[in-house]
């Protein structure tokens, strides 16, 4: 099962970029599978981020960015 991730202007971390195969983070849509999303969740948990996703993962970038901004505060 694949979920779309909207990555407009997204530069979260090297780990996230490696998950999406070092693709450019310019204005484009990226498809990643559920295993990669799980790997991303594990990385974010290790970084101390508390990120909740809806069951369709539709708000993944907003949730990740919000959690990372909270970590920087």
Curated annotation (Swiss-Prot):
List the protein's name: Protein OPG058
**A Pfam family annotated for this UniProt entry:** Orthopox_F14
**Protein keywords:** Early protein
Q: Which gene encodes it?
A: OPG058
**Family classification:** Belongs to the orthopoxvirus OPG058 family.
Q: Which InterPro entries match?
A: Orthopox_F14 (IPR009280)
State what induces this protein. Answer: Expressed in the early phase of the viral replicative cycle.
